[in-house]
């Protein structure tokens, strides 16, 4: 049974959301009917509807406004998650199934900007959740420590180009911390959206960063997701970046079991990342197109691309440099997601040259 204090918070939160002019997908799809149907349910990890929606209630300017506290939440609270997923992921219906993992021909993607005129850097990342553990809000301190132990010992077995060092955030020296900040590797305690979702408990316990010696391969442990696996480098050689990521994921997958769902693909804390979990992005200078951000976003939208500021979500473009990535991660294969970004960026560069 969901206890009364939680129910009271839910009722208060629901009326706050209903009377607000929030533009979030949560507000759009959390009808009174759906609310009444879901408010008394809880998963085997004791997660309730409140765990899913509290960030969206606290931050009425959220775009989405919902997180999954554990893998079960996607099924138990499907009446709310499904329409939000369908809306965000371009018509992925509740009868649709995400295709099996397919990285495609890793050698078929090349350098998007051989002359180094436009693209500053290229990055491809994916997220993974470890089977048998809930997501951030439900993790105990002991589980955080156990997961960090598993992840660091797994990563220490990587060889060749992926060989590197794991740095726990707990007890990290000021020097190491500064070095990681200078490299833009260090993640900070979550923003207000993640804070409100209870994704930052026991910080910095269980959190850590691994990177290879070349600083082109990076793993975040227990940031927003259990694992964020990242491949990146300066310039526009998407092919090389993607190849490295695929190699890394395959190596890690031999050693760790990931949380996967037949319908939704790989499971993540935020429903925007479901499926492939792949976000392929460039930091790019398009001075002519970017003179009008609204116009840039409109053109990018035609290619299913998302425009963000230089430092990611909720930031401005510094020095005219934008972060542009694929928007769709669900209902298509990993290769298709990256190819969509590849083709879209190629088009944007072509348009920039024509202006």
Swiss-Prot record:
Q: Which GO terms describe its biological process?
A: phosphocreatine biosynthetic process
Superkingdom in the source lineage: Eukaryota
Q: Which Pfam families match?
A: ATP-gua_Ptrans, ATP-gua_PtransN
Q: Quickly give the catalysed reaction.
A: L-arginine + ATP = N(omega)-phospho-L-arginine + ADP + H(+)
Which cysteine pairs are covalently linked by disulfides here? none
Name assigned to this protein = Arginine kinase
User: What's this protein's function?
Assistant: May play an important role in the energy releasing mechanism in the visual system. By acting as an energy shuttle and/or as an energy reservoir, ARGK can provide both spatial and temporal buffering in delivering energy in sensory cells.
**From which organism does this entry originate?**
Apis mellifera (Honeybee)
């Amino acid at each position: 049974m969901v206890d009364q204090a939680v129910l009271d918070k839910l009722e208060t939160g629901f009326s706050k959301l209903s009377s607000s002019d929030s533009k979030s997908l949560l507000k759009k799809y959390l009808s009174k009917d759906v609310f009444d149907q879901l408010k008394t349910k809880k998963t085997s990890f004791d997660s309730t509807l409140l765990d899913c929606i509290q960030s969206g209630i606290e931050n009425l300017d959220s775009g989405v406004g919902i997180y999954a506290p554990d893998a079960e939440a996607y099924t138990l609270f499907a009446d709310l998650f499904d329409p939000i997923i369908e809306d965000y992921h371009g018509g992925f219906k509740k009868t649709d199934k995400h295709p099996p993992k397919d990285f495609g021909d890793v050698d078929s993607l090349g350098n998007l900007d051989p002359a180094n005129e436009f693209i500053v850097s290229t990055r491809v990342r994916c997220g993974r959740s470890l089977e048998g553990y809930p997501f951030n809000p439900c993790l105990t301190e002991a589980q955080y420590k156990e997961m960090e132990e598993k992840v660091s010992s797994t990563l220490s077995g990587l060889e060749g180009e992926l060989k590197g060092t794991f740095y726990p955030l707990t007890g990290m020296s000021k020097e190491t911390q500064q070095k990681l900040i200078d490299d833009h590797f260090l993640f900070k305690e979550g923003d207000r959206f993640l804070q409100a979702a209870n994704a930052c408990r026991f910080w910095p316990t269980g959190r850590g960063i691994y990177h290879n010696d070349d600083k082109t391969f990076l793993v975040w442990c227990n940031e927003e997701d259990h694992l964020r696996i990242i491949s990146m480098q300066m310039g526009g050689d998407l092919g090389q970046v993607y190849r490295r990521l695929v190699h890394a994921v395959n190596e890690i997958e031999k050693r760790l079991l990931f949380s996967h769902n037949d319908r939704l693909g790989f499971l993540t804390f935020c429903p925007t990342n479901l499926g492939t979990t792949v976000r392929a992005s460039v930091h790019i200078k398009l001075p002519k197109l970017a003179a009008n951000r609204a116009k840039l976003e409109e053109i990018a939208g035609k290619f299913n691309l998302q425009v963000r500021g230089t430092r990611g979500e909720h930031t401005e473009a510094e020095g005219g440099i934008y972060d542009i990535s694929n928007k769709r991660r669900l209902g298509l294969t990993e290769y298709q997601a990256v190819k969509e970004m590849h083709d879209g960026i190629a088009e944007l560069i072509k348009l920039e040259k024509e202006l």
